[in-house]
C-alpha cells in the first residue's frame, strides 16, 4: 500500500506523513482560510507523475496550472472532490479529476 497522496487543488504528491506534518506547501493558506484539514483536500488516488524542477520555466507546469508552485512531483489527475468551503474561495477552480471539460 502506498503512503503517497496528492493535493486535490495543486496536485503535488507527498507522503501522508508530510501532509500531516507540514500541510500542502502550495495550498495550506487556502485550506486554513476555508477551515478544512489538509487530509480532506488530498487523495490517495491519482494518476501520472511529473517532476517539476523549475515550474516557472516549464510548459508542462503551465499546462497543469502549477507554474507558480514549488518544485516537486505533481499528479496529472487526482481523484476526489474538494470540500465546498474551499471551492467557494476559488472562482476559477478547475477540478483535477478530469470532470471539467474545456
Curated annotation (Swiss-Prot):
Q: What does the UniProt keyword field contain?
A: Centromere, Chromosome, Metal-binding, mRNA processing, Nucleus, Transcription, Zinc, Zinc-finger
Database matches in SMART domains: Spt4
Task: Provide the family line.
Answer: Belongs to the SPT4 family.
Subunit text: Component of the SPT4-SPT5 complex. Interacts with SHE2.
Q: What does this protein do?
A: The SPT4-SPT5 complex mediates both activation and inhibition of transcription elongation, and plays a role in pre-mRNA processing. The complex seems to be important for the stability of the RNA polymerase II elongation machinery on the chromatin template but not for the inherent ability of this machinery to translocate down the gene. Structural and functional component of the centromeric and heterochromatic loci linking chromatin structure with kinetochore function and gene silencing.
Print the miscellaneous field. Answer: Present with 4490 molecules/cell in log phase SD medium.
- In Swiss-Prot or TrEMBL terms, this protein is called Transcription elongation factor SPT4
Q: Which organism is it from?
A: Saccharomyces cerevisiae (strain ATCC 204508 / S288c) (Baker's yeast)
Q: Which gene encodes it?
A: SPT4
Amino acid at each position: 500500500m502506498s503512503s503517497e497522496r496528492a493535493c486535490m487543488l495543486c496536485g503535488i504528491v507527498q507522503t501522508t506523513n508530510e501532509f500531516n506534518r507540514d500541510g500542502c506547501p502550495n495550498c495550506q493558506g487556502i485550506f486554513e482560510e476555508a477551515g478544512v484539514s489538509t487530509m480532506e483536500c488530498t487523495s490517495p488516488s491519482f494518476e501520472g507523475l511529473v517532476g517539476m524542477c523549475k515550474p516557472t520555466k516549464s510548459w508542462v507546469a503551465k499546462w497543469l496550472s502549477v507554474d507558480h508552485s514549488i518544485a516537486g512531483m505533481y499528479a496529472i489527475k487526482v481523484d476526489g472532490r474538494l470540500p465546498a468551503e474551499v471551492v467557494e474561495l476559488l472562482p476559477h477552480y478547475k477540478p483535477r479529476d478530469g470532470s471539467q471539460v474545456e
